[in-house]
Regions:
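Start-transfer (signal-anchor) and selected internal transmembrane alpha helices
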Residues: 12-14, 156-184, 272, 367-369, ...
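Extracytosolic helix-loop segments that constitute the early lumenal/periplasmic catalytic or substrate-binding loops
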Residues: 183-187, 201-225, 232, 239, ...
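Transmembrane-lumen/periplasm boundary regions of multi-pass, lipid-linked membrane glycan transferases
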Residues: 202-208, 339-343, 347, 352-471, ...
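Transmembrane-helix motifs of polytopic, lipid-linked glycan transferases
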Residues: 254-276, 314
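Membrane-interface transmembrane helices that cradle and orient dolichyl/undecaprenyl
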Residues: 272-276, 315-334, 344, 514-518
């Protein structure tokens, strides 16, 4: 505790030199403001007059002014304010400039958030001045502790290379792991968790199949979606809901987090074994995996990704756990791999066998010194047996389904072969230049890591630099990452979701190499945490002003403040920076869950009177994606739900009859439509570029929040 107080005192109890430095910092800031104003005037009145759009001209002028003003401030702070610091002269200029700009933008976010919060209780000009004051303090502190800090540190701990031996390391990580488990459980039954539109389709198929009373064939209200995936996921949903008798989001989703936690446990155990039975590395690997954005987004909903990731990574964990004996086995291990791979195929697709075989083949070749003849005689027969066994398990679907031709038509041809559709020319064009290009797929590694993208990039760079010193197991894990990437470059449709099976391997690599990565990578994670938490706080204040603070949980506001303080303290205290990166990322997920919980009951649900009025009735719900109306079955379980295109103002007249109802979406501030019998708060999705631009310029509540009103089909909108 005394050490923690000492850190806070060093940050905020400034000596005379620091006060003088802050005065210099302020004087430089004044010159930057003056230069910013001059540049904006010159651009607006003279340089950019050829731009007819006044709004675009002003924004370009402001961007130019900010860039030049920030560059001016960076130069003089480097040459004058912090000229006594070693880093001011010996750090690469571009690297230091990026750090300075990042610190400035963090200050801007703090100013905007504080101004929007304080304007509830004081005049906006006074609130803005207070926001500027706190932002200046934050900006100065970040630059003093990070951009121009006293010591240059290449490792995590500036006081020593063995940070993992710090007394608080393991307790902090264990607390972070407990926090992660809680984050995954909280809000699991919410309508508004981060998910994917496929979840609604899978729910609809599960419900229809359960209603049919048969395991096979699969059923759906949309004939084109009947066999979109193998049956294992839908059988899981049937069992967890007891054939639909306990139909709820929580009942459908809880098996997903069981799969995700099992994968995290397997990841931690593997890192523990490969790291010399070091429990710190094991806990860290599990924590990294759970803190990846892709794990949080796809590891909780009712999707194929949680079980698929478990089964696929199990194949490679088995090989590493019993290495090198597993590579010499010709029957036992290939049989186990065939069973595991078969479960993966029956969860997602027979095509999943390709990356599994590619990864295992590269592993066998690497272990045999790339001797192809030895690979063909000793490893290939086992791989062929694994393939036959896995495909045999997948073929059970065809064997037991009474309509195998429909499976071939919808799943094999439509769902899988269709992704390779198109000629060679169009494939190459998409490979290099489309939104699904190979470059986008490569970037997906870091998008999947989310706020841990910076440490992941650092691990990749360090691993490449020291590739000759890498252990055999590290090389194998990198071969698996490369294999799955190369395989999924082939389909015309490329998505970061296809790479999820390799994210546990990256978590293990990060746990093994984290102490080789510079502290700056983890500092950037904490800056990113602040950059996300501040907008969440801003949106929370904006929504509270519209609908009232009572809609929020009592712990929402103190948790936001605590999470931001935790990230700032982790930056200020070098020994905490790396260890607290994953828990800080998890705090962002919990803050987002708390914010989205506003749109659950009671604010995001229809009241009891509305639910009773719609019992036995038909409600038409606008859909901008397939099966979106499925969510309203959880809100109105005794109502017949039907969907219509969201591009229409109302359901088609020919499809409706008197006594039916439909949903009208209006802004929060709009009055109730005539004849409305109830409403609920909602958050919108799938915004146009124009709407995104308008939200970025301040019109948030108009486009991000809305109300769903239920009106009779005979009532005018």
């Amino acid at each position: 505790m005394s050490e923690q107080r000492g850190t806070i005192r060093r940050v905020f109890h400034w000596s005379w030199n620091q006060r003088h430095r802050f005065l210099q910092f302020g004087m430089v800031g004044v010159t930057g403001i003056a230069l910013n104003q001059i540049v904006i005037w010159l651009c607006q009145e003279h340089l950019y007059t050829a731009i007819g759009d006044l709004s675009l001209r002003l924004n370009l002028a402001m961007a130019t002014g900010i860039l030049i003003g920030m560059t001016n401030n960076f130069h003089w702070n480097r040459k004058w304010t912090w000229k006594d610091r070693y880093r001011a002269e010996h750090t690469p200029l571009l690297k230091q400039y990026i750090q300075y700009c990042t610190a400035n933008w963090a200050g801007i976010l703090i100013q905007v958030a504080l101004t929007n919060l304080l304007v509830l209780w004081m005049p906006y000009l006074v609130a803005n001045l207070v926001g500027i004051g706190f932002a200046s303090l934050a900006n100065f502190t970040l630059n003093d502790l990070w951009t121009y800090r006293h010591v240059r540190t290449e490792g995590i701990d500036p006081e020593g290379a063995q940070l993992e031996r710090a007394r608080l390391a393991l307790p902090l990580l264990l607390c972070g792991l407990v926090l992660s488990l809680c984050v995954y459980i909280v809000g699991l039954g919410s309508l508004h968790i981060l998910s994917n539109g496929d979840e609604l389709v899978y729910m609809q198929i599960t419900r229809a199949t359960a209603a049919s009373g048969h395991w096979l064939p699969l059923a759906s209200e949309d004939p084109a979606m009947v066999n979109t995936k193998p049956p294992l996921l839908f059988w899981q949903g049937i069992l967890s809901t007891d054939w639909g008798t306990h139909w709820s989001l929580l009942a459908l989703r809880w098996p997903s987090i069981v799969w995700t936690f099992a994968t995290a446990l397997m990841t931690g155990m593997l890192a523990w074994r490969l790291g010399g039975r070091d429990i710190l590395r094991g806990v860290l690997a599990a924590l990294f995996f759970l803190a990846f954005f892709s794990t949080f987004r796809y590891g909780r909903p009712f999707l194929t990704n949680p079980p698929e990731t478990f089964w696929v990574f199990s194949c490679f964990s088995v090989m590493l756990w019993w290495s090198p004996g597993s590579f010499a086995s010709r029957l036992a291990v290939p049989t186990v791999l065939g069973l595991l791979a078969g479960c993966a195929l029956l969860t997602k697709s027979f095509a999943q066998l390709v990356p599994i075989l590619a990864g295992l083949s590269l592993w066998h070749l690497s272990m045999r010194g790339w001797r192809w003849r030895e690979f063909a005689t000793r490893a290939l027969p086992g791989l062929l047996w694994t393939s036959v066994l896995a495909l045999g398990i997948f073929a059970l679907w065809f064997a037991f389904d009474p309509k195998p031709a429909a499976i071939w038509r919808h799943f094999v041809v439509g769902e899988n072969v269709g992704k390779m559709a198109g000629g060679i020319g169009s494939w190459f064009e998409g490979f290099l230049f489309s939104g699904d290009s190979v470059w986008t797929l490569a970037l997906s590694w870091f998008l999947n890591a989310g706020l841990l993208a910076f440490p992941l990039f650092g691990v990749a760079v360090e691993s490449w630099k020291h590739r000759r010193e890498a252990t055999r197991e590290e090389r194998l894990l990198w071969w698996w990452v490369l294999a799955i990437f190369l395989v999924f470059c082939i389909p015309a449709q490329r998505s970061g979701r296809y790479l999820l099976e390799a994210m546990p391997a990256l978590a293990v690599l990060m746990a093994l190499r984290w102490h080789h990565v510079g502290r700056n990578a983890f500092v950037l994670t904490h800056v990113g945490v602040l950059a996300v938490l501040v907008p969440i706080a801003w949106l929370s204040v904006t929504l509270a002003r519209e609908i009232g603070i009572a809609w929020f949980s009592w712990w929402h506001w103190p948790f936001l403040a605590g999470a931001m303080a935790f990230a700032a303290l982790s930056i200020a205290k070098p020994r905490w920076t790396a260890m607290c990166a994953a828990p800080a990322a998890m705090s962002v997920y919990l803050a987002l869950t708390s914010f989205l919980a506003v749109f659950d009951a009671p604010g995001g649900a229809f009241d009891e009177r509305t639910v009773a009025a719609l019992k036995g009735k038909t409600l038409w719900v606008p859909e901008n994606f397939r099966s979106v109306a499925e969510l309203h079955r959880f809100l109105l379980p005794d109502t017949t739900i039907r969907g219509f295109a969201s591009s229409l103002d109302a359901p088609p007249v020919k499809s409706t009859s008197v006594g039916e109802y439909y949903i009208v979406t209006e802004p929060l501030s709009s009055r109730a439509p005539e004849g409305a019998i109830g409403c609920r708060g909602q958050i919108t999705s799938r915004h146009s570029p124009q709407q995104i631009w308008e939200m970025a310029t301040g019109r948030i509540s108009e486009h991000l929040f809305c109300r769903e009103w239920i009106v009779p089909v005979s009532a005018p909108k």
